[in-house]
């Protein structure tokens, strides 16, 4: 199994294999997930002080905040998957 990485903005990269969901931060349930992760010490803020536009949830229950749109992250995720398929 090859490690796939996704750029989530500002030079920050996450492992594509660990991503469970990429969501928008506006809904109340997602805001609760962010608050709970902060309380557990499992919140990673990769926004560099900018507005949070995407919330990435991993299989290890870490929550990553990104300043780029969820659609952009998802497109990078799909492109990463497509490159692996073509290479194999």
UniProtKB/Swiss-Prot annotation:
- Taxonomy, superkingdom: Bacteria
Family annotation (NCBIfam families): MtxBflmRegRemA, PRK04323.1
Q: Which HAMAP family does the protein's record reference?
A: RemA (MF_01503)
User: What family does the database annotate?
Assistant: Belongs to the RemA family.
Q: What is this protein called?
A: Putative regulatory protein Npun_R3866
Species assigned in the record: Nostoc punctiforme (strain ATCC 29133 / PCC 73102)
Q: What phylogenetic lineage does the species belong to?
A: Bacteria, Bacillati, Cyanobacteriota, Cyanophyceae, Nostocales
């Amino acid at each position: 199994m090859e490690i796939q990485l996704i750029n989530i903005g500002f030079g920050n990269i996450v492992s594509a294999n660990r991503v469970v969901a990429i969501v928008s931060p506006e809904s109340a349930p997602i805001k609760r997930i962010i608050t709970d992760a902060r309380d557990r010490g499992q919140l990673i803020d990769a926004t560099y002080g900018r507005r949070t536009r995407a919330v990435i949830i991993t299989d290890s229950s870490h929550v990553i905040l990104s300043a780029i749109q969820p659609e952009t992250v998802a497109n990078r995720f799909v492109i990463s998957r497509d490159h692996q398929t073509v290479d194999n």
